[in-house]
């Protein structure tokens, strides 16, 4: 997906278009899961976080600003969510 296509999907999502989320999900599910799994190394947690990621992305659609490459932006969000989860799990131990 190009930056322009991604930006279009984010704009559509900001206007309530769930099909746009499906397009991003189909394009980036494997990438996001890989980023999360490679950080947390627990399949079930990675699956949960991947689902949470796309829910969060839908909520971020209206505030998305293009410019720095959407793939990097997506992976930073996924990695930060994973690190937050690891910290929360460590506190529970």
Please identify what each model-predicted range represents.
Residues 1-11, 23:
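Intrinsic, short, N-terminal disordered tails of RNA polymerase sigma-factor systems
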Residues 62-66, 76-93:
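Arg/Lys-rich amphipathic alpha helix in sigma70-family domain 2
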Residues 2, 66-67:
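Residue-level signature of the cytosolic catalytic core of signaling kinases
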